A protein has these predicted regions:
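A compositional/biophysical signature of low hydrophobicity enriched in polar/charged and small residues
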Residues: 1-152
Length: 152
């Protein structure tokens, strides 16, 4: 799908505030409400806009620890990849999982209450997976930049 500058302007506004009204978008980009509504519907139907979410303050929800894990599987087979991905998709602590190139296979981002809670997750859920050969855990000391907004 080819996006023009109006589409990109609408997307920038929606990324910064998913609850922004069509009226406010109209005022911001100087376009009437009807074509804005039509463009948003088209962007949704084409899958450019996948869903609308609410970002939560994890610290206020007692999820103060962010951990990045580099996971290496014992064998790089299609079955191992599939089984690992299906299993970790069920763990709510894991908020991001990427299959990567390089010296490990997966890069995970997870949130937990504290180190003790992470240790329990590590020992009881992650390290016991039969296809996992190695896990390197990196504890976030400070988040310098965290955003879901894509550069448009």
């Amino acid at each position: 799908m080819i996006l023009d500058e109006l589409d990109r302007s609408i997307l920038r506004l929606l990324q910064s505030n998913a609850l922004i009204t069509i009226k406010d978008i109209s005022a911001a980009i100087n376009l009437s409400m009807s074509p804005i509504h039509d463009r948003i519907k088209r962007l949704e139907q084409e899958g450019v806009i996948q869903k609308y979410v609410t970002l939560l303050d994890r610290k206020q929800l007692d999820l103060g620890l962010v951990v990045h894990c580099q996971v290496t599987l014992d064998k790089q087979t299609r079955n191992n990849f599939s089984e690992f991905e299906q299993t970790i998709a069920k763990f709510p602590e894991i908020i991001s999982c990427s299959l990567v190139s390089g010296s490990f296979d997966y890069y995970l981002k997870l949130v937990t209450k504290d180190v003790e809670t992470y240790n329990k997750f590590y020992q009881e859920k992650l390290a016991v997976l039969p296809m996992v050969a190695h896990i390197n855990s990196l504890f976030v000391m400070d988040e310098i930049k965290t955003t879901t907004e894509l550069p448009l």
